[in-house]
């Protein structure tokens, strides 16, 4: 059976993006995104809130775009996959693990006052296969034009209702 590793987040950036470049020149961008859940506590009746922080990494062109346009506080939509990586602590030499979201789609949300143009959607980084372009759709032949039916003139304007229907 096939498996699914898909993450979708809508949240706010907790800090400005950090962009760096690998030795081969590929851009790498790290951001922290906060998502907030709200609920009403059944026992006390008071409103509760919990914020979860997510580490997100973007690569290549998507990383460059994020570094240029995203700012702390900006609302953003992210699609990607979970990835756990293993690394060694420099001080102790112990194996450490980090789970992060590798983003392959990013959509900036909000208006211009939140740091950039609204509605800018970007994807990239992992689809190395060339995309096939579809041939332009053929328009069906236009139906022959018929003259528009003529409306009969109102017999008497006084017979019309003065009430506006909306």
From Swiss-Prot:
Q: Which Gene3D superfamilies match?
A: Nucleic acid-binding proteins
Position of sequence motif Important for interaction with partner proteins: 161-166
- MF GO annotations: single-stranded DNA binding
Q: Which GO terms describe its cellular component?
A: nucleoid
Instruction: Describe the location of the SSB domain by residue ranges.
Output: 4-110
Q: Output the Pfam families linked to this UniProt entry.
A: SSB
InterPro entries according to UniProt: NA-bd_OB-fold (IPR012340), Primosome_PriB/ssb (IPR000424), ssDNA-bd (IPR011344)
Region annotated Disordered, chain positions: 108-166
Compositionally biased, Gly residues: which spans?
A: 112-126
Q: Name one GO biological process term.
A: DNA recombination
Q: What does it do?
A: Plays an important role in DNA replication, recombination and repair. Binds to ssDNA and to an array of partner proteins to recruit them to their sites of action during DNA metabolism.
Q: How does it assemble?
A: Homotetramer.
HAMAP family per the UniProt record, alphabetical: SSB
In Swiss-Prot or TrEMBL terms, this protein is called Single-stranded DNA-binding protein
Native organism is Bordetella pertussis (strain Tohama I / ATCC BAA-589 / NCTC 13251)
Q: What is the lineage of its organism?
A: Bacteria, Pseudomonadati, Pseudomonadota, Betaproteobacteria, Burkholderiales
